[in-house]
Amino acid sequence: MEDSQMDTSSPTESSSEVNFTAEEDKSQETRSAAGVCYCGKERNLNIVELLCATCSRWVHETCVSYQLGKGKLLPFITNYVFVCKNCSASGLESFRKSQATISQMCHCAIANMQQAASRDGRRQIQFSKDKEIIPYIEQYWEAMTTMPRRLTQSWYSTVQRSLVKDVQTLFTYEEHAEHGAMYGLFHQDLRIIKPNYESMSKSGALRLTDDGYTQASLSKNNRQKRKFPGTDSGPTGKKGRPSSDITANVKLPPHGYPLEHPFNKDGYRYILAEPDPHAPFRQEFDESSDWAGKPIPGWLYRILVPHSVLLALHDRAPQLKISEDRLAVTGERGYCMVRATHSVNRGCWYFEVTIEEMPDGAATRLGWGREYGNLQAPLGYDKFGYSWRSRKGTKFTESHGKHYSDAYVEGDTLGFLIELPEEASLDYLPNTFKDRPLVKFKSHLYYEDKDKITETLKNLHILQGSRIEFFKNGQSQGVAFEDIYAGSYFPAISIHKSATVSVNFGPAFKYPEVLVEHKAKGMHDRVEELITEQCLADTLYLTEHDGRLRLDNMGL
């Protein structure tokens, strides 16, 4: 019974699993020139590479932020759908491996053995079914397919049928006097092995939408109710088990941050990381199998800098509800806080907040806060924040409230301006965190950084000439705070009970005249600045530690 379920495709279907045509050969060189990895380096057949279903870019596995797991994939597999971060509206990759046919597994096994021989300086293009192909599939079964490993050997006969059936389309055959039946690849160029997305698309098994999602079209008898993002645990098969079909929906994270992620709490902060293509010994690490199950050196990665200013998903109290576009937040019960993704440490900056809903008993404290501000308290509770309260217009810092303005209410649009004079003696480059440990959470890597609250409090100093000013519906309410502590400040929102506010980080402000009058920048301008600063900081770290960043220093 097992045997009959494993490979029932026709010769035509099998040969289309990997797209080999005359047109493919002619156009391969053109496409490969345009389809290099994020890192800019050429293809490397010794490691896993994934083909984007949208742009046909080949991406090295170790340049993918999504942690696929060392040893859990093989080069030359074709049973997957991958969307690169450049084609995804979320800014993060999506990947789904499907169940492979025995024909695909044979093809993958032969290709890997051929490449291994070439890497060792040998030329071997044909392999024994019994002595090499079947043992290879048995060894790497889980890396090739999502299909459960077979408990009997009945699938051996399926291998034989698949190889014979696809001779002259996928495989070559030769009878050897000593070794018996020998099989090789009909197309010797391993660079053209890839998923046949075109065939999947034509058959309805794959559909690419504008925002990079990949999903199947459902038949009339198999339509599902629409589900909202984050409410679906994935498609299921018989008996409610997760489906591994290529037609399954691929769930993408919203706006460049994983749906499931660690929160900053209990004295630790977590910073999303991505592979650093400029790190030394990157290729040696990529091709090494010795790192399976071992800690990855932090300097091989870098901080993933957000490409837009939004409310942070990880840097918030978990009970706060963030909208899908990450530009609105709703509170629940007592005061708690969320910070934005970007901070500022010098210059004059501005953002706006609109009070969307303010039920009876609800309140907000809005303003600017630093990274160590308590997320389970109102902004202005400690020395790390400066806030403006909706009730009575009170201003707060260090839990001391002073009258500042009239109250603000539902429908008001508030402006928040901060001015931080530059200090010549300070280094404003951001931390690289490359010396911090990397922790894995739900297939993504994060730098883990311990809070240094005591040390930070000890080193607080006043920044002369600094100020914070608040605006209501375009009108200044006066300077709220002067000579505040120096440091990096985030737009911060704290909410009591079920109030809802929306944020506007620019460029289309409701009251743009505030920027002109005060020569301020909108928070949206901070994006390119931070990308440049982070790149420079990473480069300086690698330069300063040149010669000391070695894989053999890590115990290999």
From Swiss-Prot:
Disruption phenotype: Generally pupal-lethal with mutants showing a wide array of homeotic transformations. Adult escapers are sterile and show pattern formation abnormalities in legs, including tissue overgrowth and small supernumerary legs. In wings, the pattern formation defects observed include duplicated bristles and sockets, transformation of campaniform sensilla (a class of sensory organ) to bristles, ectopic campaniform sensilla and reduction of intervein tissue with increase of longitudinal veins and cross-vein tissue. It comes from the Eukaryota. GO terms for biological process: brain development; chromatin remodeling; dendrite morphogenesis; imaginal disc development; imaginal disc-derived wing morphogenesis; imaginal disc-derived wing vein specification; instar larval development; negative regulation of gene expression. SMART domains: PHD, SPRY. Residues 1-27, 216-251 are annotated as: Disordered. One of its GO terms (cellular component) is MLL1/2 complex. In larvae and pupae, expressed in imaginal disks, salivary gland and fat body cells. No expression detected in central nervous system (at protein level). PROSITE patterns: B302_SPRY, ZF_PHD_1. A zinc finger (PHD-type) spans 34-90. Zn(2+) 1 binds at residues 37, 39, 60, 63. Core component of several methyltransferase-containing complexes. Component of the SET1C/COMPASS complex, composed at least of the catalytic subunit Set1, wds/WDR5, Wdr82, Rbbp5, ash2, Cfp1/CXXC1, hcf and Dpy-30L1. Component of the MLL3/4 (Histone-lysine N-methyltransferase/demethylase TRR) complex composed at least of the catalytic subunit trr, ash2, Rbbp5, Dpy-30L1, wds, hcf, ptip, Pa1, Utx, Lpt and Ncoa6. Interacts with hcf. Interacts with trr. Transcriptional regulator. Regulates a number of genes involved in wing development including activation of net and bs and repression of rho and kni and controls vein-intervein patterning during wing development. Required for correct expression of a number of homeotic genes including Scr in the first leg imaginal disk and Ubx in the third leg imaginal disk and haltere disks. Required for stabilization of the histone-lysine N-methyltransferase trr and for trimethylation of 'Lys-4' of histone H3. This is Set1/Ash2 histone methyltransferase complex subunit ASH2. It comes from Drosophila melanogaster (Fruit fly). The lineage of its organism: Eukaryota, Metazoa, Ecdysozoa, Arthropoda, Hexapoda.
